[in-house]
Regions:
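Non-catalytic alpha-helical scaffolds and adjoining flexible linkers that form interface surfaces
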Residues: 1-168
Length: 168
């Protein structure tokens, strides 16, 4: 067995699932296939792995965004949203609330008028709960998980029936 020497001063960067990176890409066949030429780690969200529930919710949000084509005009807003959401997943105890708030913000960033169309369809008690979830900081949230789940499901049902956003 022969050891392959590395160039002096080069380090191999192992990228992780939720890492934010700067990439230099290159194509050898007129843009049909792209390869990573260089990568630079910007931020690692390692804390997301501290809990299975957090990992599941963060993965669901990332998959939702990946599944839906983001208009060029809203890409910066969605990138900021993802950055904020991943940081929140890393520090918050309530991943369900982070996901719900992030889903709502994503749909709003895509231009859908949730406040005007979805919100009024909720029963009064759910409107109050939704407003508290969306407007209060995570650290002050006290909503029961069942309430968050119910509101998330109602929002997802609305999105399936009234938008082009792919939930599943």
């Amino acid at each position: 067995m022969q050891r392959i020497a590395k160039k002096a001063g080069t380090l191999t960067l192992s990228l992780d699932l939720f890492d934010e990176v700067d990439l230099m890409m290159e194509s050898s066949n007129e843009g049909r296939t792209w390869f990573i030429k260089e990568s630079r780690l910007v931020h690692r969200h390692a804390e997301i792995g501290r809990s299975y529930e957090i990992l599941v919710q963060a993965s669901a949000l990332a998959a939702l965004i990946a599944r839906n084509t983001v208009d060029e005009a809203s890409r910066a807003a969605v990138a900021d949203l993802l950055r904020i959401a991943l940081a929140a997943f890393g520090t918050a105890d309530r991943a369900d609330i982070v996901y719900f708030k992030s889903l709502y913000r994503f749909v709003r960033a895509e231009g859908y008028p949730l406040k005007e169309q979805w919100f009024p369809t909720l029963p009064a008690a759910d409107r109050t709960s939704a407003a508290e979830l969306l407007n209060r900081p995570l650290s002050t949230q006290t909503a029961l998980p069942a309430v968050v789940t119910r509101l998330r499901r109602r929002l997802e049902e609305y999105l399936r029936g009234h938008t082009e956003i792919l939930i599943d």
